[in-house]
From Swiss-Prot:
<dbReference type="GO" id="GO:0003684">
    <property type="term" value="F:damaged DNA binding"/>
</dbReference>
<dbReference type="InterPro" id="IPR023713">
    <property type="entry name" value="Endonuclease-VIII"/>
</dbReference>
<dbReference type="InterPro" id="IPR000214">
    <property type="entry name" value="Znf_DNA_glyclase/AP_lyase"/>
</dbReference>
<dbReference type="Pfam" id="PF06827">
    <property type="entry name" value="zf-FPG_IleRS"/>
</dbReference>
<dbReference type="GO" id="GO:0000703">
    <property type="term" value="F:oxidized pyrimidine nucleobase lesion DNA N-glycosylase activity"/>
</dbReference>
<feature type="active site" description="Proton donor; for delta-elimination activity">
    <location>
        <position position="253"/>
    </location>
</feature>
<dbReference type="Pfam" id="PF01149">
    <property type="entry name" value="Fapy_DNA_glyco"/>
</dbReference>
<feature type="active site" description="Proton donor">
    <location>
        <position position="3"/>
    </location>
</feature>
<dbReference type="InterPro" id="IPR044091">
    <property type="entry name" value="EcNei-like_N"/>
</dbReference>
<dbReference type="InterPro" id="IPR015887">
    <property type="entry name" value="DNA_glyclase_Znf_dom_DNA_BS"/>
</dbReference>
<keyword id="KW-0479">Metal-binding</keyword>
<feature type="binding site">
    <location>
        <position position="169"/>
    </location>
    <ligand>
        <name>DNA</name>
    </ligand>
</feature>
<dbReference type="InterPro" id="IPR010663">
    <property type="entry name" value="Znf_FPG/IleRS"/>
</dbReference>
<keyword id="KW-0238">DNA-binding</keyword>
<keyword id="KW-0511">Multifunctional enzyme</keyword>
<feature type="zinc finger region" description="FPG-type">
    <location>
        <begin position="229"/>
        <end position="263"/>
    </location>
</feature>
<dbReference type="Pfam" id="PF06831">
    <property type="entry name" value="H2TH"/>
</dbReference>
Length: 263
């Protein structure tokens, strides 16, 4: 499943295609959304927001399309008039004069008013988004030490969207390697330096992934390109200590780590 950085890049692509352009055609597959089709024609997308793995497409008439891709949903951008060859089932079409965005295969799709945005069950449940530029390490540290989270093992906590939205398995693995901790550690057992390092890594790692993953221009990014240090690298030597990276299962997900420097 895509994690926060991939969802945010998808949102960027949707914005680049249709933001600010009048909608010339709107289509929804689900009957409960059909009545919104005519209400959105002539309106425009003001921005596309991410809340963890959910996408909020905001329209100029104050309605918001909520969508969660789950395992199979995917957004595509096409030239208007183009019909992609795919076996996926179309759920949403938002068309402008030159570009159209299409949502396939997703099942969790709703239209929300401003009031419903504040009471939506999923949006109420998720924690702060790691890609929110206003989220600081200090706030993350407060959450780590809160009664709700301080006794949780990191193996499960870093996958819990109620703690921080946008984290997933590859980020869990890479963050814990960065700070030399294991999935069995808990916030309540860390010293001040470890807590500080973890709070920063919980933001720095996903933000670096979002900003540079897939980029190759090391001059532009000063060598700080995101790449996997342990994820999918079991059997290889750890670049930090030379130990052999191992693979196990934690919280029902594959977990990669180096026993030589994560303890």
């Amino acid at each position: 499943m895509p994690e926060g950085p991939e969802i945010r890049r998808a949102a960027d692509n949707l914005e680049a295609a249709i933001k600010g352009k009048p909608l010339t055609d709107v289509w929804f597959a689900f009957p409960q959304l059909k009545s919104y089709q005519s209400r959105l024609i002539g309106q425009h997308v003001t921005h596309v927001e991410t809340r963890g793995k959910a996408l909020l497409t905001h329209f100029s008439n104050d309605l918001t399309l909520y969508s969660h891709n789950q395992l199979y949903g995917v957004w595509r951008v096409v030239d208007t008039g183009e019909e992609p060859q795919t076996t996926r089932v179309l759920r949403v079409k938002l068309q402008t004069a030159d570009k159209t965005i299409l949502l396939y295969s997703a099942s969790d799709i709703e239209m929300l008013t401003p009031e419903q945005l504040t009471t939506h069950p999923f949006l109420q449940r998720v924690g702060p988004d790691v890609l929110d530029p206003n989220l600081t390490p200090e706030v993350v540290k407060e959450r780590l030490l809160s009664p709700r989270f301080r006794n949780r093992q990191f193996a499960g906590l870093l996958l819990d969207q109620a703690f921080l939205a946008g984290l997933g398995n590859y980020l869990r693995v890479e963050i814990l390697w960065q700070v030399g901790l294991t999935g069995n550690h808990k916030a309540k057992d860390l010293n001040a330096a470890q807590l500080d390092a973890l709070a920063h890594a919980l933001l720095d790692t996903p933000r670096l992934s979002y900003a540079t993953r897939g980029q190759v221009d090391e001059n532009k990014y000063h060598g700080a390109l995101f790449r996997f240090k342990v994820f999918h690298r079991d059997g290889e030597p750890c670049e930090r200590c030379g130990g052999i990276i191992e693979k196990t299962t934690l919280s029902s997900r594959p977990f990669y780590w180096c026993p030589g420097c994560q303890h």
